[in-house]
């Protein structure tokens, strides 16, 4: 039964990513926490397992997105390069930070983040382009913060990278495309870090590679890669404002549940 949950979750995450332009991690992590709890996984490790698994799935789902954006020349590779230098370091530190946070506290942190993202989507809050692109040190520092936070929340960083780039006067289309590209190094560095940090944890269930649960990774990755395209197509046929409000409502429910 749990394998069907992973396949459906991957499909939903893919559709949501295509519809709203956000990484599937914001919905994958909560559902995995509920699924792992239902399966009787140890409470002390299941949240970290959900975060690590979510990040590992983004490694695969980000590839299709980056290729699509690259074909139309929307990725600012010069920005990507310097952001990535900070991301690689920040993601490793973020995973290490998460390993020192208890499962209950980590759930509350993710719950607060889900509510913040929901509020941003519901009110359509966007930073105004008010500053120019920073120099190399500034991009590296920004990448470090984005990588650190993304590793803790189990996301690909789109909720952080896009606002930063648009604030720095990067056009929205290029900001989304460059953010998608940044999701790959975030996911790779974070997933590897979670694997290493959980490698010898005796509380992990069978078929785990550190804090990455392989059955969930496989099921989610397979379907999300296909359904992301469907979501992107659907986005052009439905009301974006109504869809964002519906997704925001879902995130409010998830966030409040994690905080209770």
Predicted regions and their residues:
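Juxtamembrane transmembrane-helix boundary motif
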Residues: 1-20, 27-48, 53, 62-152, ...
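Hydrophobic alpha-helical transmembrane segments that constitute the membrane-spanning cores
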Residues: 24, 188-193
